[in-house]
């Protein structure tokens, strides 16, 4: 080891001398004001070359440990990235919808699950609640759930195109409340019969334009067709509106029906803090509506009035924010997609534990090589290399290993995304769709590399050259004690992962 270290130091000295001659020649022909800049640039490039050269030599000399380190960290970083795509998707669900913080779905007490609410109401009640509070900016009927795409056809001249389209039913107020924006055409045209609007993605995919007609019953695309009057901008993908491909105006359908409780209503408040105000103002509206529904007036019997008051005591109106919809547990038969907050927190904890295991493995590998590298490190010190340079060299080696691991992790993620295993997640693990998660993974990896190498680097460079021949940390009681602590901690983390 010392012979190799001497050779490396000699090569480094020759390289430094050669480059110094070049920089001197350049400086002699450059203005004096540039001399400090040239020298700074020279030493920075020289130091980078020194670290890179040592990193390559380390890979060559310690092939087995380097390979195991890279593979282990690649699996850990890949697993961390995949898990975090799901966690990021769930915590971001509905969060970027415009005005999501002050947009709420109306819910009433569930008849089937005491203490919970459901979002199904009749249109007369929904309209009354929307119009009965001064805190409402706008509101209307909307559809948070989506069905399966249905086969439909459209005709372009002599060509008929077969498509699959998922449509949803909204009222005009619901369209305004959910902030539909027309990219082409006009959403106001939806008030006309037999019209619909489609999303930008659907329009581009199928070549649909404003003025086209779509039929669900005629393969020729003509009979019973609906006219496309607008193309609306796509919504956030991981949201209840991300599935909307087509929308049409429900008009006055079921507007007078008090027996069809299969509609959902949404309101946008003037301010998010007015939630309790709306819930309070909704109760007189509920009383008036229910009294008409059950014909409770002055002519009603005392027993009927008592039962009615008892029912009102159990009645309440609750607003559930769009931002809370995904994780909320207060709804029975929740519309749209739903998630489990406990599961996501557990997944987040697992991701962190995986990184900790990888970090411990990395530190153990580093300390396992201390006896083999100690002599060469002190040879460098004898030849005048400063301790800070050696520490930075070890940190540079760690960063290099992490970068190799990240490259391999990207390949593993790509293979996972192309395999059937990716179906177990509801998130898209593609790197292009998860730039923030990718940036987080790289940041965590680099921080782990630097943090995990600082103490070992400081330790291995702390010995005086004259004392190196007297013993070995690898066989000392302190060395064994540290390794046992790390292995025990790693074992505890593994047990925690199994339990989770």
Predicted features and spans:
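Selective transmembrane-helix segments that form parts of the transport pathway or gating/packing helices
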Residues: 70, 74, 389, 394-408, ...
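Feature of multi-pass inner-membrane transport and sensor proteins
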Residues: 17-20, 24, 38-53, 57, ...
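Small-residue-rich transmembrane alpha-helices
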Residues: 318, 398-465
């Amino acid at each position: 080891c010392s012979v190799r270290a001497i050779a490396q130091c000699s090569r480094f000295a020759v390289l430094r001398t050669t480059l110094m001659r070049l920089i001197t020649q350049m400086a002699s022909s450059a203005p004096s004001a540039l001399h400090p800049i040239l020298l700074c640039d020279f030493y920075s490039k020289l130091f980078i070359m020194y670290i890179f050269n040592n990193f390559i030599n380390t890979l060559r000399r310690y092939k087995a440990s380097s390979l195991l380190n890279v593979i282990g960290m690649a699996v850990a970083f890949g697993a961390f990235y995949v898990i975090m795509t799901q966690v990021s998707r769930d915590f971001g669900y509905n969060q970027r919808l415009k005005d999501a913080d002050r947009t709420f779905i109306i819910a009433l007490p569930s008849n089937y699950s005491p203490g919970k609410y459901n979002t199904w109401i009749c249109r007369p009640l929904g309209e009354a609640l929307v119009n009965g509070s001064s805190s409402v900016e706008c509101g209307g009927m909307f559809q948070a759930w989506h069905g399966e795409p249905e086969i439909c056809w459209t005709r372009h001249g002599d060509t008929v195109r077969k498509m699959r389209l998922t449509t949803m039913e909204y009222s005009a107020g619901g369209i305004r409340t959910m902030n539909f924006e027309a990219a082409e055409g006009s959403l106001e045209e939806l008030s006309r019969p037999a019209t619909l609007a489609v999303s930008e993605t659907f329009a581009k995919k199928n070549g649909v334009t404003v003025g086209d007609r779509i039929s669900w019953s005629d393969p020729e695309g003509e009979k019973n067709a609906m006219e496309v009057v607008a193309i609306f901008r796509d919504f956030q993908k991981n949201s209840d509106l991300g599935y909307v491909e087509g929308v049409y105006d429900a008009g006055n359908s079921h507007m007078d029906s008090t027996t069809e409780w299969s509609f959902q209503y949404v309101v946008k408040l003037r301010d998010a803090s007015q939630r309790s105000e709306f819930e309070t103002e909704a109760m007189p509206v509920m009383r008036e509506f229910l009294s008409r529904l059950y014909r409770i007036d002055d002519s009603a019997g005392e027993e009927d009035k008592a039962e009615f008051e008892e029912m009102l005591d159990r009645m309440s109106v609750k607003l559930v924010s769009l931002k809370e919809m995904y994780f909320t547990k207060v709804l029975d038969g929740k519309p749209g997609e739903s998630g489990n907050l406990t599961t996501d927190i557990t997944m987040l904890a697992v991701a962190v534990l995986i990184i900790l295991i990888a970090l411990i493995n990395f530190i153990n590998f580093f300390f396992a090589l201390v006896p083999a590298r100690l002599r060469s490190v002190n040879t460098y010190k004898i030849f005048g290399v400063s301790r800070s340079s050696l520490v930075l060299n070890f940190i540079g080696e760690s960063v290099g290993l992490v970068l190799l691991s990240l490259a391999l992790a990207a390949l593993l993620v790509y293979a996972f995304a192309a395999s059937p295993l990716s179906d177990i997640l509801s998130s898209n693990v593609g790197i292009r769709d998860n730039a923030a998660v990718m940036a987080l993974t790289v940041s965590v990896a680099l921080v782990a590399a630097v943090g995990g190498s600082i103490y070992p680097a400081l330790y291995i460079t702390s010995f005086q050259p004259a004392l190196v021949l007297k013993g070995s940390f690898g066989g000392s009681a302190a060395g064994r004690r540290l390794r046992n602590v790390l292995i025990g901690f790693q074992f505890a983390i593994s047990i925690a992962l199994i339990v989770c």
